[in-house]
């Protein structure tokens, strides 16, 4: 995507990090939203190896990045760098979004509420059984949400036994 508006020193920067993150649709989605809303902002994807996570998080503050989303494999490990963790993220054991407030790192998890809200919008039936493909961080959040909604049954299908 070409950023049609000139990027300046005042442009707000948001990003997603993961290993890999370059495949993420987040930049396309966010940049389209920024354009539609007339925001002076840009959203980028950065591949960040696990051993570079701490530097990436602290770099967020150093470079004035306004918000950061996280994908695999960083959602659990990043928690130790947070000054405050939202109760839901703490219960799920995973953070997928970071913002800085008053110089402090705040970690959130939007996987569970976003997924459950989407299911409810499409007529979620708690009397039905659900199949969840995958057992990573996002899947854990979705399983948590489905369990709290009282679904009849939940089947988790994964390629490996490690999760």
How would you name each of these model-derived features?
Residues 163:
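Conserved short alpha-helix immediately C-terminal to the canonical SAM/SAH-binding motif I
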Residues 18, 107-109, 119, 123-151, ...:
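Glycine-rich adenosine-cofactor-binding loop
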Residues 2-122:
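Phosphate/diphosphate ligand-binding glycine-rich loop within oxidoreductases
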Residues 48, 159-160:
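Short beta->alpha hinge that forms the Motif I/post-I loop of the SAM-binding pocket
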């Amino acid at each position: 995507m070409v950023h049609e508006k000139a990027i300046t020193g005042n442009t707000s920067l948001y990003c997603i990090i993961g290993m890999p993150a370059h495949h993420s649709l987040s930049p396309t989605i966010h940049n389209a939203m920024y354009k539609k809303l007339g925001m002076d902002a840009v959203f980028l994807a950065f591949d960040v190896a696990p051993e570079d996570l701490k530097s990436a998080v602290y770099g967020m503050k150093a470079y004035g990045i306004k918000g950061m989303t996280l994908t695999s494999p960083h959602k659990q490990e990043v928690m130790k760098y947070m000054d405050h963790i939202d109760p839901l993220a703490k219960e799920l054991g995973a953070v997928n979004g970071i913002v800085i407030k008053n110089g402090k790192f705040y970690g959130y998890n939007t996987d569970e509420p976003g997924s459950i809200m989407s299911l409810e919008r499409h007529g979620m039936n708690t009397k039905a059984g659900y199949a969840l493909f995958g057992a990573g961080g996002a899947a854990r959040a979705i399983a948590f949400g489905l369990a709290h909604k009282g679904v009849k049954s939940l089947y988790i299908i994964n390629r490996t036994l490690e999760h």
